[in-house]
């Protein structure tokens, strides 16, 4: 899989690409991450990529020409283009699972006051990572990169993926490790029993209860589908 990020801040991704699972995935040729600065495609004599908004208003708006030319430069017939914007559809695990099937994913990071609205004519998806505002789309891009890359076969173990949060609309069950007793807080006895059938049963109950308390929206989905 190849993922191209269009950004004004290439250096933002240097440490990300050289850390942990992402670094291993790149080294093992499981994913190719390309960072492209769309300022390099500006035809303005001063390499400007923004301008004042029509109708007035605060801030500067990203102009179409550099971004569209950058898209056309990296895009192939197998590419899917994603605009990272607070007005997009909220990102979730289902979308991550969809994105991992694409041969080439292009993520567009905004900045300043945002994009010229006409950019939507050049993208396949408009995605938001939540109801809050960031200075730019780079953090959102890294969230999507991480969540998609870890789903690529052989990046992490299948067993780890099968028991994660959001599987079947349930949060993950609580995990415990040594020591057994920490300041009076003890590991539930059932986990020490060796009875895996009972452990699996209790863990499922914990998942349901945790989801019901912390994520009522997911719990409602779970009830509808089970």
Swiss-Prot record:
Q: Which reaction does it catalyse?
A: guanosine(37) in tRNA + S-adenosyl-L-methionine = N(1)-methylguanosine(37) in tRNA + S-adenosyl-L-homocysteine + H(+)
| Function (record text) | Specifically methylates guanosine-37 in various tRNAs.
What is the name of this protein? Answer: tRNA (guanine-N(1)-)-methyltransferase
Instruction: Report the superkingdom from the record.
Output: Bacteria
Transport found in the keyword field: no
Q: Recorded GO terms, molecular function?
A: tRNA (guanine(37)-N1)-methyltransferase activity
Question: What InterPro entries does the record tag this protein with?
Answer: Alpha/beta_knot_MTases (IPR029028), tRNA_m1G_MeTrfase_C_sf (IPR023148), tRNA_m1G_MeTrfase_TrmD (IPR002649), tRNA_m1G_MTases_N (IPR029026), tRNA_MeTrfase_TRMD/TRM10 (IPR016009)
């Amino acid at each position: 899989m190849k993922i191209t990020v269009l950004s004004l801040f290439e250096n933002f991704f240097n440490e990300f690409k050289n850390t942990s699972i992402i670094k291993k995935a790149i080294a093992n040729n499981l994913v190719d991450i390309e960072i492209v600065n769309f300022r390099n495609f500006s035809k303005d004599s001063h390499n400007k990529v923004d301008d004042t908004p029509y109708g007035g208003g605060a801030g500067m708006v990203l102009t179409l020409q550099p971004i569209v030319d950058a898209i056309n430069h990296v895009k192939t017939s197998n590419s899917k283009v994603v605009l990272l914007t607070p007005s997009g559809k909220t990102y979730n695990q289902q979308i991550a699972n969809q994105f991992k099937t694409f041969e080439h994913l292009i993520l567009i990071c905004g900045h300043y006051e945002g994009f010229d609205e006409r950019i939507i004519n050049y993208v396949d998806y408009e995605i938001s990572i939540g109801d809050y505002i960031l200075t730019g789309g780079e953090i959102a891009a890294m969230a999507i990169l991480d969540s998609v890359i870890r789903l690529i076969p052989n990046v992490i173990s299948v067993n780890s993926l099968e028991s994660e949060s959001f599987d079947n609309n349930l949060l993950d069950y609580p995990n415990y490790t040594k020591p057994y007793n920490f300041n009076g807080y003890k590991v539930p006895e059932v986990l020490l029993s060796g009875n895996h059938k009972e452990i699996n049963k209790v863990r499922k109950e914990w998942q349901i209860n945790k989801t019901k308390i912390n994520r009522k929206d997911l719990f409602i989905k779970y009830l509808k589908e089970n």
